[in-house]
């Protein structure tokens, strides 16, 4: 059985990247929450 995590930088950026977050209203909410919390990295 193969492992479930097969890392791909491009897929990772497209689903969890900054532009992906900015594309939707909820994604922008995620960013604002992370800013409020003081996260060093907002996205991947």
Curated annotation (Swiss-Prot):
UniProt keyword annotation of Ribonucleoprotein present: yes
Recorded GO CC terms: ribonucleoprotein complex; ribosome
Ranges annotated as biased composition (Basic residues): 31-44
A Pfam family recorded for this sequence: Ribosomal_L34
Region named Disordered: 24-44
Molecular-function annotations in GO: structural constituent of ribosome
Organism domain of life: Bacteria
Keywords in alphabetical order: Ribonucleoprotein, Ribosomal protein
BP GO annotations: translation
Family: Belongs to the bacterial ribosomal protein bL34 family.
Protein name: Large ribosomal subunit protein bL34
Species this chain originates from: Azotobacter vinelandii (strain DJ / ATCC BAA-1303)
Native organism taxonomy: Bacteria, Pseudomonadati, Pseudomonadota, Gammaproteobacteria, Pseudomonadales
Record gene name: rpmH
């Amino acid at each position: 059985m193969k492992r479930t995590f097969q890392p791909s930088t491009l897929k990772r950026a497209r689903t969890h990247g900054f532009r992906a977050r900015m594309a939707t209203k909820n994604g922008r909410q995620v960013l604002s929450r992370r800013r409020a919390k003081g996260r060093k990295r907002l996205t991947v």
